[in-house]
Swiss-Prot record:
Pfam family, one: ArsA_ATPase
Lineage start: Bacteria, Bacillati, Actinomycetota, Actinomycetes, Kitasatosporales
InterPro entries in alphabetical order: Anion-transp_ATPase-like_dom, ArsA_HSP20-like, ATPase_ArsA/GET3, HSP20-like_chaperone, P-loop_NTPase
Top-level taxon in the UniProt lineage: Bacteria
Protein name, entry field: Uncharacterized protein SCO2128
Record-level Gene Ontology MF annotations: ATP binding; ATP hydrolysis activity
Family statement: Belongs to the arsA ATPase family.
Organism expressing this protein natively: Streptomyces coelicolor (strain ATCC BAA-471 / A3(2) / M145)
Amino acid sequence: MRTLLITGPGGTGRTTVAAATALTAARQGTRTLVLGTDRDDTLGAALGVRTGPAPTSVEPGLTAWRPDAAQGFRDALAALQDRAASALDLLGAARLDPQELTPLPGADDLALLRALREAALAEAHDLLVVDLPPAPRALALLAAPEELRRALRRLLPPERQAARALRPVLGRLAGVPMPTEALYEAAARWDLELAAAESVLADRNTVVRLVAEPGPAGADAVRTTTLGLALRGLRTDLLVANRVLPEDTPADSWLSGPLAQQRKTLEEWRGAYDVRAVAHLGHDPRGTDDLAALAVPGVNPDASPVEWPVTDRLAEDGVLVWHIPLPGAVREELDLVRRGDELAVAAGPFRRTVPLPSALRRCTVDGAALRDGTLAVRFAPDPELWPRGR
């Protein structure tokens, strides 16, 4: 199954483009599911049908689904209380009525990750189009599975679970209670769910498509978003320049100024991205006829994979070089920190800690340089760890 994640700056029509992309694919014979994320039914408004917690058939080959984050939160709370029933009874605590609660901050994102996993693992469709939130929130959402799994491993290392029988003894010796079996079981469940979502994002059939309105603000947002996606190793296929004004706009029209800005930005974008322009219809698209009139680009089956290759230059320079693509990065906004077998990379407002390839774990960082949008990190072999004879 192919997965197309669509995001961009807020207010640039990403939901409309997601709906139109799904419609185009369905009419080309691809069984398509479009997944909405807004609490307001903006996806349904674009498609001309109401969407909600139950999948809705828009037309043959196209289904729309907008998960209910609030209901998912209530269901999760009920399940948690069921598992902790004995502890609650022991404490004399009254159970919370799920209907009286509203979702906590972040519940929407967790619900979307769960829905993304469920939809991608199902076999009912060939293409999943996801209308992600605006770019800043989308980047945090896409980073969540990896970051949360890393935090779980640090807080509750799996290898410590082997000492189940020793926990009561260790607790008495330390004078503090040790983590209970239930805590480790909950962590294992969370890790399993997060791993499934992470595998969908890392799959070779998953790509991100950016939508932006050409102009100064759009250009800045695209540059920042592209950098954030690159640091996460996520593939992008196209940049959709949305709401492009007609070229035959009269010179004395008030639209001539915005058109000039769009032309300038489009020229810059075409030098850096695979850009597809989508015309402004003169009104907000509503319904499948309007979506078809947009003539959005179809799904690109040949998006290039993201690679972070290691180059062996031991014979020439005595180093191994790790190449990390970071388009749009600025040298003054880069930072690297080596921590054991991991490398923390900061680029602009983004940060990621990545495990080192096995060969580089036996090396020390020897420097780094940013050239043509690629960060080249040099590693020198550690004589105490590097095999003799190399």
